[in-house]
Regions:
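Metal-dependent polysaccharide deacetylase catalytic core of the NodB/CE4 family, i.e.
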Residues: 27-113, 117, 121, 128-146, ...
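A conserved mid-domain beta-alpha-beta active-site/ligand-binding segment of alpha/beta enzyme cores
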Residues: 143-186, 192
Length: 257
């Protein structure tokens, strides 16, 4: 069977995250869910009871206090969002959280230091077209978003996110495909042959708004048929796997941080 590692990230803490968790449970897959306490953009966020229920089945990470884009606030507010978001989430769950996700994928180097200082073990970005865990554990990248992006969005993100040599083969594998969903399948097939990690991410609100539940369910079933149980990880597991077996998910010539 495949040696590829699969992980799924779900952002924003919408109550419909619980529906994604049900699909994951049916296919015996693992995932990491990143929850703010509130969402300043007005989207609903699951209650404390719902968050505790979700934590029985999946890893829960922080997404700041108010789903705050850190690059849009001063350093004092950024620190408050990071540190208090962690504290309040842990109080709701009754246990520590290790993971953090930068809202909107927006952060500067000083925010990475704040996340470390707050006591997180890793942080995730929305940088895409990666087949490994990136350069260090506080800028964990992804492979693709489960969303009908047009081709020009992929190209624009490729240009803006750098690391071109590292991401070029993934872009080549999918860029000729017009159908966004087929791009995800094609990238999976490509990484199964040439990569180490397939890291999918999504928002439950997008899945609901675009009525993509059937497509998500079918793709996750496809993954479950291809990926053995030991290669189905949440992001904390991915970081542990990265530390334990550097050769699996991190190039030999680079430093593990």
């Amino acid at each position: 069977m495949s040696s590829l590692v699969f992980t799924l990230s779900v952002d924003d803490g919408h109550p419909l995250d619980l529906r994604i968790a049900e699909i994951l449970a049916r296919h015996r897959l693992r995932a990491s869910f990143y929850l703010p306490i509130r969402n300043a953009e007005g989207a609903p966020v699951m209650t404390a009871a719902q968050a505790r229920e979700l934590s029985r089945y999946a890893e829960i990470g922080s997404h700041t206090l108010d789903h705050c884009f850190l690059t849009r606030v001063d350093d004092n507010e950024a620190w408050r969002q990071i540190s208090e978001g962690k504290t309040e989430l842990e109080q709701r769950l009754g246990h520590a959280v290790s993971g953090f996700c930068y809202p909107g994928g927006q952060f500067h180097a000083r925010h990475v230091h704040m996340v470390r200082r707050a006591g997180f073990g890793y942080a995730r970005t929305i940088n895409n077209l990666y087949s490994d865990t990136g350069e260090q554990r506080f800028t964990l990248p992804t492979s693709l978003q489960f969303y009908p992006h047009k081709r020009d969005v992929l190209i624009r993100n490729f240009i803006s996110q750098g690391a071109y040599k590292r991401r070029w083969s993934a872009l080549q594998a999918i860029i000729a495909e017009d159908n966004w969903l087929m791009r995800i399948y094609r990238l999976f097939d490509h990484l199964e042959q040439h990569g180490q990690v397939f890291h999918l991410w999504c928002h439950a609100l997008d899945i609901e708004r675009l009525q993509l539940w059937k497509e998500l369910d079918y793709f996750l079933g496809f993954v479950a048929r291809r990926i053995p149980p030991g290669r189905r990880l949440d992001n904390s597991g991915l970081i542990r796997d990265r530390r334990r077996d550097v050769a699996l998910v991190f190039p030999d010539h680079q430093k593990v941080v």
